[in-house]
């Protein structure tokens, strides 16, 4: 069963990177429609996620990017995947006419999760040292899933800490 935070091959982020074949600037507005904060990442040419900002519910982030620059979003507190325009990876497209400036609106929404996944992830809000005692009564398979979620949350935290914010004044709307 997928835990919702990883790609099918077990990674928190897809194995994609940016290229620079098209240098036309594209304006994008990411709008968070989730009930929780989300982190917005650009996947750089080295295939590493670069965090551009954290968006609270109903807040937005305006950025300038290019075609062939993939973007993803993750739930801030645990790295669970969310959707950008109903897809796991957003690929910006330039305006149909060269002299037309258009802002692409990208709506970030929750990904559908099973009840089992939601229940397992509910333990992530507890202090990690308390979780083993709280899950003792669960079947062994569910205990392993909760421990897996905790490991992924830790891995996500480490990635976010390593991620270097982009230069310049582009920041989330307050």
Swiss-Prot record:
The keyword Calcium does not apply. It comes from the Eukaryota. Pathway: Protein modification; protein ubiquitination. GO terms for cellular component: Cul2-RING ubiquitin ligase complex; nucleus; VCB complex. GO terms for biological process: protein ubiquitination; response to hypoxia. Keywords: Ubl conjugation pathway. The keyword Disulfide bond does not apply. InterPro entries: VHL_beta_dom (IPR024053), VHL_beta_dom_sf (IPR037140), VHL_sf (IPR036208), VHL_tumour_suppress_b/a_dom (IPR022772). Disruption phenotype: Increased mortality induced by B.thuringiensis pore-forming toxins Cry21A and Cry21B. Increased mortality and sensitivity to paralysis induced by enteropathogenic E.coli infection. Increased mortality upon heat stress. RNAi-mediated knockdown causes an enhanced resistance to polyglutamine or amyloid-beta-mediated paralysis and an increase in adult life span. Belongs to the VHL family. Involved in the response to variation in environmental oxygen levels by targeting the hypoxia-inducible transcription factor hif-1 for proteasomal degradation when oxygen levels are normal (around 20%). By regulating hif-1 expression, plays a role in iron homeostasis, aging, heat acclimation and progeny size. Mediates resistance to enteropathogenic E.coli. Mediates susceptibility to B.thuringiensis pore-forming toxins. Not involved in P.aeruginosa susceptibility. Interacts with hif-1 (hydroxylated on 'Pro-621'); the interaction induces hif-1 degradation. May be a component of the cullin E3 ubiquitin ligase complex. This is von Hippel-Lindau tumor suppressor homolog. The gene is vhl-1.
């Amino acid at each position: 069963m997928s835990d919702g935070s990883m790609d099918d091959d077990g990674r928190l982020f897809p194995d994609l990177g940016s290229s620079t074949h098209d240098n036309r600037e594209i304006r994008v507005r990411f709008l968070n429609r989730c009930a929780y904060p989300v982190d917005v990442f650009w996947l750089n040419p080295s295939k590493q996620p670069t965090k551009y900002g954290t968006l609270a519910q109903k807040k937005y982030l305006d950025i300038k990017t290019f075609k062939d620059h993939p973007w993803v979003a993750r739930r801030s507190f645990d790295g669970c995947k969310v959707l950008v325009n109903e897809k796991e990876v957003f690929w910006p497209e330039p305006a149909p006419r060269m002299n037309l400036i258009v802002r692409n609106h990208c709506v970030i929404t929750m990904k559908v999760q099973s009840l089992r996944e939601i229940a397992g992830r509910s333990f992530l809000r507890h202090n990690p040292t308390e979780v083993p005692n709280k899950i003792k009564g669960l079947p062994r398979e569910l205990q392993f899933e909760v421990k897996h979620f905790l490991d992924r949350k830790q891995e996500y935290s480490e990635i976010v800490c390593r991620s270097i914010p982009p230069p310049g004044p582009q920041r989330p709307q307050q």
